[in-house]
């Protein structure tokens, strides 16, 4: 294009004659081959005014359009924070982000769009995979070599030659060598026989976490000592040195244990771990819905009277089955609603609060309604201002009260006494008394009638066995020894009296030494001095009692 003169471009000016004049009919259009964007039609000897007159003007109403009908973009430009400049929102100048910011699948589509056209021409019809050998790599290389190096040479303006050389197909093959296989096999899509679990998983329906067919069968639940997560290195001293070191349960742990007792969940051990309690807490609403559905089914099965009689103490021992309700209806004509109202008339206010809770509109959790008293205390017991029970604890925390700043909490008196066996309940007391009465009735077969009540009195040691006693005292001793000899055989009666006689009045000697004292014979006639009497007696009590007898 540099060979064109400037006068050529001005209107109404003809080009100057060149060295060789070409006649007008032989003048042809010149095209630069291989450079399509440089194509330019050159008119020789024709002015632009004549050419402008030859163009036919087309006036067609269909070409006109209403610019208001074109929907404008929501905004024409935006402030790009990356470049810090105003960028066009649409059009050719709109900035394209880098490949790392493209959405998923865009890179493969762009790569497929940039792929070169297939080299060569197809000689036959496709066989759809029946003859895979027809698409060998060598065949492609032959076709590529036949078409390689093909170029065209055309003459440009002013006698310049421009050569357009096609890119060799070897470079193209090198680019696509990785993605091409040796041959292509067309396969029909296989029909997938999905199981119920795979179908639920693919469709997004609720399904178990593990395929039930491939899941390993879990054995019997192990105790807390056998579970590996409860293993601890055994210390030399007992860890539970105080009964106050027991971990206080929190709400989630108690609820998880209650759900495990009712069979709604399964825990591996005696007490739920923090993980099991957290999993049960995460599915709290689902578990509650399941429990409410089970309660509704039970209500429909057994009837409302039998269902609500659980919270009416007066109706606990009464037959509330459907047959009994129907029989009562046939006898009295009262329908089920009337009988239900009658039953609720026997319900106390406390039972109504337990049954319905604080608000009759809220469906209460059946698990909380039927919790034992100790579980309720574990959750809702304690001080609401400084909670000691109903908060989440550290599982490895061991409270140590042995420091100077701490002391063991003062226990409640009644549970403490009952725990140590110092206090018993009334029922247990009556049971023990009944057992003792039965034992007495079995052992005592015969008791002689004693008219004198003093005959059965117990000797508390007023008289000494080592002194000469009166006849009345001897008779009293014989009478006292008689009930004791009745318990044994008749042959052992004398031995029992002798053994009883060996134990002297000096009980302190028997307590300290464990041996009975042999009685010392001393005459009452011999008068002892004060020092001798003190030395002769074993202790002060014996001395004083002997001194009183001497007087």
Swiss-Prot record:
Any one cellular-component term (Gene Ontology): nucleus
Residue segments, region Disordered: 76-161, 463-529
Entry's Gene Ontology BP terms: plastid transcription; positive regulation of DNA-templated transcription; positive regulation of red or far-red light signaling pathway; positive regulation of thermomorphogenesis; protein catabolic process; regulation of plant organ morphogenesis; regulation of transcription by RNA polymerase II; response to blue light
GO molecular function: transcription regulator activator activity
Positions of disulphide bridges: none
The keyword Transit peptide appears for this protein: yes
Sequence ranges of Acidic residues compositional bias: 467-476, 485-498
Protein name: Protein PLASTID TRANSCRIPTIONALLY ACTIVE 12, chloroplastic
Organism this protein belongs to: Oryza sativa subsp. japonica (Rice)
């Amino acid at each position: 294009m540099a060979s064109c003169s400037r006068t050529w471009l001005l209107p109404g000016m003809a080009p100057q004659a060149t060295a060789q004049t070409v006649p007008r009919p032989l003048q042809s259009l010149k095209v630069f081959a291989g450079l399509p964007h440089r194509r330019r039609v050159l008119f020789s000897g024709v002015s632009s005014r004549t050419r402008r007159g030859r163009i036919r003007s087309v006036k067609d109403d269909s070409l006109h359009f209403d610019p208001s009908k074109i929907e404008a973009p929501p905004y024409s430009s935006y402030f790009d924070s990356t470049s810090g400049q105003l960028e066009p929102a649409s059009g050719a100048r709109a900035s394209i982000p880098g490949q790392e910011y493209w959405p998923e699948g865009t890179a493969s589509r762009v790569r497929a769009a940039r792929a070169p056209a297939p080299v060569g021409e197809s000689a036959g019809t496709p066989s759809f995979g029946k003859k895979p050998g027809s698409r060998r790599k060598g065949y492609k290389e032959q076709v590529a070599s036949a078409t390689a190096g093909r170029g065209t040479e055309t003459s440009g303006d002013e006698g310049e030659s421009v050569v357009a050389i096609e890119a060799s197909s070897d470079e193209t093959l090198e680019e696509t060598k990785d993605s091409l296989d040796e041959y292509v096999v067309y396969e029909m899509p296989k029909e997938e026989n999905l199981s119920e679990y795979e179908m639920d998983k693919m469709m997004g329906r609720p399904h178990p976490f593990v395929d039930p067919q491939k899941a390993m069968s879990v054995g019997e639940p192990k105790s807390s000592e056998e579970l590996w997560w409860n293993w601890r290195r055994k210390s030399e001293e007992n860890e539970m040195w105080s009964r106050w070191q027991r971990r206080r349960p929190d709400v989630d742990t108690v609820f998880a244990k209650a759900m495990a007792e009712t069979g709604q969940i399964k825990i591996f051990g005696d007490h739920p771990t923090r993980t099991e309690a957290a999993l049960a807490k995460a599915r709290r609403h689902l578990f509650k819905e399941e429990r409410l559905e089970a309660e509704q089914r039970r209500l429909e099965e057994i009837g409302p009277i039998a269902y609500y009689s659980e919270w009416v103490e007066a109706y606990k021992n009464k037959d509330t089955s459907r047959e009994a309700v129907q029989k009562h209806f046939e006898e009295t004509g009262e329908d089920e609603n009337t009988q239900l109202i009658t039953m609720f008339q026997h319900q106390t206010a406390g039972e109504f609060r337990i049954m319905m809770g604080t608000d009759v509109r809220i469906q209460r959790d059946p698990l909380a309604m039927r919790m034992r008293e100790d579980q309720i205390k574990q959750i809702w017991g304690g001080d609401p201002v400084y909670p000691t029970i109903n908060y989440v604890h550290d599982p490895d925390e061991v409270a140590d009260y042995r420091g100077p700043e701490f002391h063991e909490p003062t226990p409640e008196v009644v549970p403490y006494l009952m725990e140590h066996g110092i206090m018993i309940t009334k029922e247990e007391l009556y049971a023990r008394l009944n057992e003792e009465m039965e034992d007495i009735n079995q052992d005592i077969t015969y008791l002689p009638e004693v008219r004198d009540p003093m005959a059965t009195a117990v000797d508390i040691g007023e008289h000494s066995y080592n002194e000469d006693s009166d006849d009345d005292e001897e008779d009293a001793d014989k009478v006292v020894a008689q009930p004791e000899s009745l318990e044994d055989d008749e042959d052992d009666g004398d031995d029992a009296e002798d053994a009883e006689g060996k134990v002297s009045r000096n009980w302190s000697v028997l307590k300290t030494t464990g041996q009975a004292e042999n009685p010392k014979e001393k005459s009452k006639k011999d008068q002892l001095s004060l020092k001798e009497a003190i030395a002769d007696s074993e202790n002060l009590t014996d001395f004083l009692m002997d001194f009183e007898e001497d007087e």
